[in-house]
Every structure is written in structure tokens, then in C-alpha cells.
């Protein structure tokens, strides 16, 4: 957790944070799609699905967000929490960041910086 509402990657969110802490999350900054960085998202979604007012923003570069839609939340591996519990009130929404451009994320200034890795990956400059 960066603060009480912004999470950096989601590897262990479902087991490392208490349910009341998970319910405060409004944004998840995702660096890349490797399993150890996203494996907690389905558990987080399941924990929030029945008691969520506003969706949690999954925030990253377009390649990461597209990969989540194609390979993770595809109703084959996991339910599509980008459309559940219903399309008008999903658990998650995707928010794309442009590399090198500063964006506001819940009061923080976040810039995605490219990182040399095996898959499309960014680090985050957070102010």
C-alpha cells in the first residue's frame, strides 16, 4: 500500500491485508502481468463484489490492461470482474497511463516509467 487507498501491484493483497483494508482500496497500480504481481486481484474482486459502491481502478499501461482482459478476467481463467457483479457496477475498471506523462491518482502524482523486463513493464514515479 502506498497510502490507504492506492495499492502498488497485487501479489498478496488477498492475504496480506485485512478485509477492512481491502475495502478502502480505490486504485491498483500494476507494473506488469507476471503472476506474482497480479495473483491477488481475483481474491480482491471476490472480497469486494458484494459490497462495493465505486469500482476499483486498475491503473497501468495499455499493454498490461489489455493482457488482464485477454488472459485473466476472461470468464475462462477467472470471472470477468470488469463486468461483474453487473456491467454498470463492476468491481474493476481499467485506467490507462501514458508512459512518461504524469497523472493524478487519488491525490498522488504518478508517472509510468518504462523498465527493461521480459514483458511490457513500468515502474512508477510517485509524488
Model-derived segments and their meaning:
Residues 1-127:
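Binuclear metal-dependent hydrolase catalytic cores
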Amino acid at each position: 500500500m502506498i497510502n490507504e487507498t492506492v495499492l502498488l501491484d497485487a501479489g498478496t493483497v488477498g492475504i496480506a491485508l485485512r478485509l477492512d483494508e481491502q475495502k478502502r482500496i480505490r486504485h491498483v497500480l500494476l507494473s506488469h502481468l507476471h503472476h506474482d504481481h497480479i495473483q491477488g486481484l481475483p481474491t480482491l474482486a471476490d472480497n469486494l463484489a458484494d459490497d462495493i459502491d465505486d469500482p476499483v481502478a486498475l491503473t497501468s499501461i495499455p499493454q498490461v490492461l489489455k493482457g488482464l482482459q485477454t488472459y485473466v478476467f476472461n470468464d475462462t481463467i477467472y470471472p470477468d470482474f470488469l463486468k461483474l457483479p453487473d456491467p454498470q457496477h463492476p468491481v474493476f475498471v481499467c485506467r490507462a497511463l501514458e508512459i512518461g506523462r504524469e497523472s493524478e491518482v487519488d491525490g498522488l502524482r504518478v508517472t509510468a516509467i518504462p523498465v527493461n523486463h521480459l514483458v511490457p513493464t513500468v515502474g512508477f514515479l510517485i509524488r
